[in-house]
Amino acid sequence: MRPTTPSTTESPDNFSNMKLLYFSNEFPHDDLAGLSRQLTLLSKQKQFPHLARFLDHATEAVRDEVRQLPWSLRNTIPSFDSVFNFIEHASLRKGELGASIDGVLLVVVQLGTLIKYYEENPKKYDLNTGNAALSGLGLGLLSTAAVSLSSSVSDLAVAGVEVVRLAFRLGVVVGSVSSNLESRDPTSPPVSWAAVVPDVTVDEARDELDAFYAREKMPSTSKIFISAWSHNSVTISGPPSRLKHLFRTSEFFRGQKIINLPVYGGLCHAAHLYNQEHVREVVSETDSLKELSSRASPKLTTFATSTGKRFEAETARELFEQIVAEIMTKEIRWGTVVDSVLAQAHTTSCSDIQVLVFRKSLPVYDLLTAFSSKQPGLEVSTLELIPTIPASLDNGTPVSGGSSKSSIAIVGMSCRMPGGATDTESFWNLLEKGMDVHRTIPADRFDIDTHHDPKGKAMNSSHTAYGCFIDEPGLFDAPFFNMSPREAQQTDPMQRLALVTAYEALERAGYVANRTPATSLERIGTFYGQASDDYREVNTAQEISTYFIPGGCRAFGPGRINYFFKFAGPSFSIDTACSSSLATIQTACTSLWNKDTDMAVAGGMNVLTNSDAFAGLSHGHFLTKTPNACKTWDSEADGYCRADGIGSIVMKRLEDAIADNDNIIGVIRGAATNHSAEAVSITHPHAGAQSFLSSKVLSAAGIDPFDVSYVEMHGTGTQAGDKEEMKSVTDVFAPAGPKRRSMRQPLHVGAVKANVGHGEAVAGVTALIKVLLMFQKSMIPPHVGIKNSLNPALPSDLAERNVRIPYTRQAWPREKDRKRIAAVNNFSAAGGNTMIAIEEPPLPRNIAPEDEDPRTTHAVTVSAKSKVSLEGNLKRLIAFLENNPDVRMSDLAYTTAARKYHHNHRIAVAAADVPQLKKKLSAQLNSIDSVKSISNLQPLIAFAFTGQGASYKSMDLQLFHHEPTFRSQILHLNSLALAQGFPSFLPAVDGSFPKDHAHSAVVTQMALVAIEISLAAYWASLGVVPNVVVGHSLGEYAALYVAGVLSASDAIYLVGQRARLLEERVQAGSHKMMAVRASLADIQKIAAGMPYEVACINGPRDTVLSGLSKDLDTLIEPLQKAGFKCYSLDVAYAFHSSQTDPILEEFGELAETGAIFHAPKLPVLSPLLGKVIFDEKTLNATYMKRATRECVNYLAAVETGAKLSLVDDNTLWVEIGPHPVCINMSKSSLRSVGAAVPSMRRDESNWATMAQSLSTLHCAGATIRWNEFHKPFEKGLRLLDLPTYAWNNKNYWIQYNGDWALTKGNTYYDAQKKALETAKALPAPRLSDLKTSSVQRIIEESFDGSAGTVVMQSDLMEADFLAAAHGHKMNGCGVVTSSIHADISYTLGSYLLKKMSPSSGDIAMNVADLEVVKGLVAQKNTKVPQMIQVSISTENINTGTAQLRWQNVNAQGIPDEPFATATLEYGDRSAWLSSWVPQTHLIQGRIEALETLAAQGIANRLSHNMAYLLFANNLVDYATKYRGMQSVVINGLEAFADVTLTTEKGGVWTVPPYFIDSVAHLAGFVMNVSDAIDTKANYCVTPGWSSMRFAKPLVAGAKYRSYVKMIPTVEDRSVYLGDVYVLQDNEIIGIVGGIKFRQYPRILLNRFFSAPDEASPSPNPTHGATAKAQAQPKTIAASHGDEKHFATSVQISTPSKIGHQLIVKPVAIQAPPPAGPVVVALKDPEVQGSPVVVASAAAAVDTNSVASKAISMIANEAALEQADLQDEASFAELGIDSLMSLVISEKLREELGVVVSGSLFLEYPTIGDLRSWLMEYYG
């Protein structure tokens, strides 16, 4: 049907008025975000249903278009739930898809606004009945098409969605074509492709452009052109760099005003770039377009902007094609549109015209001006639509109910059920067999003999001894889930199994993260039901440790699933008692319906270990006392049997599941939850509420109750519950009224609890999985709950109502005329009711012949995280093939590669059929031990681009015929070639000629480069992107394109022009090229004096010569006689020889003006220069000219790349070309390569080559986007339900011991309290009268000649000692300062000397080499002793030295490992003073210099109060008597202080600690206050010093001056050293030498300096302690925020067996056993990675080294085997999380003195990394 609008030649009835709708190419509002918000809010109101539908469907259309994009583009688009989300993504709108995104936004805003206007004013939509016309600019023309095709607002909402699709596709095509002209730099701001030049006529602009073309030779595709013009301005478009060059070099344009337009997406209105193929690419034949074309045709005149004429279109498709062609290929001449509008107004004799616009703009003003000047009598009005949208909306406006709900597809499921059901198949087996799997409560839960009393009299006991239990619920593959054994053991097994079943369900669903929009990580949520915390309450509560909270609290179950899979959607743990899992699934459905998520993982979990719940439910009369699962509907039903269970399902909206090619196993049509508010009690069921719920769900889903053929009932086996539920079901699904079920529509009912008991929180998902299995098996399993007779309380007319209880298996086949629908009930003891209506899955779609996968060879992959699992996965796949010999290879390859996660142990094989595949997989099974784990680091990838002559003259490329990315790129490049005046090169690639047919040089060479550019694009789409490129001869053009140096257009231009010049200037065949298998030196020696030229040096023994044919022929004989093979290359010209001389100058000129050379984005290995090119100057026209003539030294290029580490032994080499040549050169030139693969081979199918190459790269560690590989063929592929992952399980289980759950008594602390009392009652004996505040009691002294030992003990809680500690507070805790340790040293040193040498007189003492490995922090409880022990000993007092050791003493009086050591040296005061004299003037000079700097305002002078205020704020809060510094001058890390010692007395001391601190803590002040240190993020503490010497006593009230300069050490920049000088009256009287400070993150302050009794019980005693002490469990405190966590050490050396389960009991860690034979992963120089057996650990590694001890400690803390700690193992994979890392870091610091930061395991992510660091710095 043609438009009814009149033309100038054919005039219908005149209309008195006319309407013109104008759609601009500019956004109609400056605040686009605000406008979109208003449209969104309006769409939620009842009066705008069409607007709501349009916005919703437009979003779905864009989502569908995104799904079709190649990954490189798809990955740039974030997840979205509305197209308006894009507005906020500025970078997206200016990126590669900017044109698509802005085009969509423009169309949606325009049409959305128009729909809103006409919904508000429905009578005004009379466009197709009156004199109306449409006009638009650019993309605005697309919006006119939607209006032209629509008879109503409802039609407009539909047609508008198709226009949104076109706008998106148009941007994609424009971006693709434009990027071939000039690629954009994603790291730089976007640049404009168009500029307006005002006040210039079109003729002036054309003349100047013609002159520019005459000066500059360039490809026609790159030319600047006029895209739009009017009477007073011109828009000039072109590649940005060309535009910039024009405006910079043209004298004419330099004098004009240039306004760059925000056109960032590419070029339109370019007839030289686009053709009808591009138009068809945009207006592709889709189902939605077919439907629209079948029911809509153009109804209104739409003016073309190039001619002003109307579009003559009969169908929607024709109209779209004409408009898209207008946008892509035609100039905008707005004046012609203005003239046509005036003509129509005149022809129709209208008296008034209304112009509808979104807002006024220049084109509108031009139109209005024309009306007023040329038709002054015409009454013209304008209506701006944007102002009709209110700025704000009334919150009270009624809101619509929203769009209709989608059905929800279940696409994956997994379970662990009682009775040994470890998967859904074994679960079905027990259902099908009618098994009742109840059993006596197993011993791994609790002792049934003590916790069960059938009479119910024993306190806290269970009345029942039965339950239904999962076998070995502790089985878990901890390393797979990156959990340490310690974390796994302390994590609730139901949460672990939820994680496992979630993985399996996702695996069966074919889930791969971000594969499609519906699998975007940001749009996936996790929903699980859980109603108990047994394991946390009982098992882990026996010894609370690090993972007590994250391993046991319910929220962490779904949270851990989200964390492991990196889902960023919501995670919910829901407790509605018995209905938890189905209520959770309903919540997940709601989330999907509301589009809060696009995919949901949901389910429930229950593992029973707490006897309290059994006791409570027994006393509440819930549980049966008899041995059965549940006697559902039995006359003697007396309650339910508790059960374990874990179930997980994966859900999507149905349309998304279909689009994602998922296996749909069931379809949820409706779901809802209500509450039995009218029940007689909260736990009593209510039939009315249940019936109401069922009716509500069926009504909302549009389901006739009689269409439901099965109801899976809650069926707990209670008298009240069974009666009420059966009544509610029969009332709704099988009523007794006049309308009854026919005999053809029986209603079967069942209850899974009769088989596996009542799983409580997991009951709902258990029932749902049963129904899903019934759909799969087309079978209803027997109901086994009736043990005696049918419950007489049930309706007596069940048979008459056609309600059937299946006592035996019943067939439930698909029917042709109706779908199988089931209902699943799940009720809560707390009163909640949930019901789900579920329909059978749709039948798999038939695969049309044209959709069959054309590939003949396929890559099948198998992977795992361990070799054990890899072997298991491989065996499972082989078994699957044995059982399914007819499986299609394409489906198998698709499922294993594109629809599975890939792990670090990989196998991949290429095969053409199943027998071949089985043979290859079996071979792999026999060599499983040789499979190496790939590194987490991606290997380097090098692209090598082939030169000419490697393939047939004519090719027939399967990639061109079948692969869209490759084909599209070839076609685009061919279009460029045609546009540049060259012949098409398609005949050289499409098989239209025999393979030996010789094409022209132009065709052949362009075809080669085009193939290589397209191959690179294809590899990139598969995720294989180079880190470095090298091109051989002609291949260098493609290499430079990939490196970003040349655009595709310029590469084609240069290659075509070079080939044209060869054809025109050079005689083909006069010269030849000859390959010689010899080195250049060999050839030079043999062919000395003979004429030849060296064309290529391809390898150490691979050279190509060029020259006259006759000259090279004479070389053959001597070379062959010398044993060197020679063969001529099949090329028409001798490249890189004198034959090319005639073309060089002209080619250089063409390259100079015709191509733009950019700086490479990748390193380029240059065969011309033998160098690596990084800069922007080397690659230019001169380079291209030289590369044509000079030698190709491929060998030098590759060797240079290796020297610069751009390629290494693990680099993956990919040959980009029609046949492998370069990769062989690379292998011969390098020591080793990781892998080398071709893209194509002669005489081999492209798909066979690609399958093998992808398999090789995959196994070598490359990340292949397998989905992109299979995506073009997905219509012909099916997802297979393959075997799930073969877990490498171990049993992680903490056994509940004893009967404390019965007694509720806790005797844990009794022994400790008794020991404390004993310690108080029996103090250590005093052996001496010596008593000071710090040395309170000598408990041991022994002297033997010149050897002697003195041991003292002191209680830190003694008043003076405690006051001294509290005088030095850190983190609010009293900390024993090092000056107290110094006083103890001086006291004991003096005592020892007097005892052993009474006549020694006044001897000075040096406290040397003090090292404090752990701070001594005062406990909070002052009523309990806190004992320390310090010993001083000397082997020979005559040496003048003695050794000191500090130890904590536990409550049993046993000393722990030393926490500090020092050496006491006796010396001569006078000698010290004399030795210090030379340094005095130096120190004085530095002090004076600081004074000068302070006077100049450079250094800071701080008062007494300010100094200690800063000190207290940053780290240490000193008591008054410690505050000796009166003023401080500080500059960077240098300072001096004036000190006055306090006269305040307090305690008995040898050298008061507040004296020592006052003169020495200037160093600590500098390290914690100086602006040279990041004191905000870090703090510094001293672990000791080299020496502390005072030649004169420190005197109360005396004045001193201290000076220090701290310097960072070279070895460790976090460690600082300095000397503190103490001066009195300008004389050095003391030095604290080599004082050391170490920097720590401030976040660890709480961890290091907390009172010990705030964290954990006493530390574990040493190995020499008593047996009683060894029995104490060891706990390590790890602070995380304000919480305290405890890590319990667990030994697995003395397990007890219960059944088949390994029960691990918490015990103390014993001394490690002697080292036995071990296997150490030492690399054999010949066989990489081969293990070497050594006799013992000591022979392989130094077990006493810090590194070895640290690795052992990590194994111990994480409960890992030493064998697990191989160098390549990453801490993340071993499960060392943030909590565990804090525990280990503290242990390393405490026990080994290794000071580490909290980021240790991030900085050194693998065992090998950490071991190397420890060996380097600690040994």
Curated annotation (Swiss-Prot):
Its EC number is 2.3.1.-. Keywords: Multifunctional enzyme, Phosphopantetheine, Phosphoprotein, Transferase. Disruption phenotype: Almost completely abolishes the production of pestalotiollide B. Its cofactor is pantetheine 4'-phosphate. Residues 1741-1818 form the Carrier domain. The keyword Glycoprotein does not apply. GO terms for biological process: fatty acid biosynthetic process; secondary metabolite biosynthetic process. Multidomain protein; including a starter unit:ACP transacylase (SAT) that selects the starter unit; a ketosynthase (KS) that catalyzes repeated decarboxylative condensation to elongate the polyketide backbone; a malonyl-CoA:ACP transacylase (MAT) that selects and transfers the extender unit malonyl-CoA; a dehydratase (DH) domain that reduces hydroxyl groups to enoyl groups; and an acyl-carrier protein (ACP) that serves as the tether of the growing and completed polyketide via its phosphopantetheinyl arm. This is Non-reducing polyketide synthase 8. It comes from Pestalotiopsis microspora. The gene is pks8.
